[in-house]
Amino acid sequence: SLFQKIRQPKSNYLIIPRVSSENRQYVPIKFATPDLIVGDAVQTIPDASLYDFGVLTSTMHNSWMRSIAGRLKSDYRYSAGIVYNNFPWPENPSEKQKAAIEAAAQAVLDARTQFPDSTLADLYDPLTMPPVLLKAHQTLDKAVDAAYGKTSFKTEAERVAFLFGLYQGLLAKLH
């Protein structure tokens, strides 16, 4: 008998580290192909789209993660059950908004390719994050915020309060 079920996706997928430094502004998420073997230190999202990558890589999702994720020492512990499954995604974004998120998400991926000798840990170190990558993320954040019907948030607490309001609305629909 197997000790654990086989989790290897059969198609392209997103990798999200289970544990990520508390110092990072963005959890480093990446696309992977089925030939890359999944270990137990990551969460996977099979068949994820560029839109999915964009929303999950945004400050909106990272703020949610920082507020509800568990901790391993002081680092964030990303959980599918708590963080991902309870995240309030943009409700009914327009095709134009989806396209803007996809374009901005692609710009994040393109910015990363400018540094082929750098690991994701290097790229997302807050002390050495390349300005071009940070700018791409900021553009993505604007596109994701727009899909939520917002143009800006003054603080992370304001952003999290907004997300919890959406979450409460989702819970109310279940009752």
Predicted feature locations:
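Polybasic, glycine- and aromatic-enriched phosphate-binding surface used to engage nucleic acids
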Residues: 1-103, 107, 170-174
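Non-catalytic DNA-recognition/assembly elements of restriction-modification systems
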Residues: 84-175
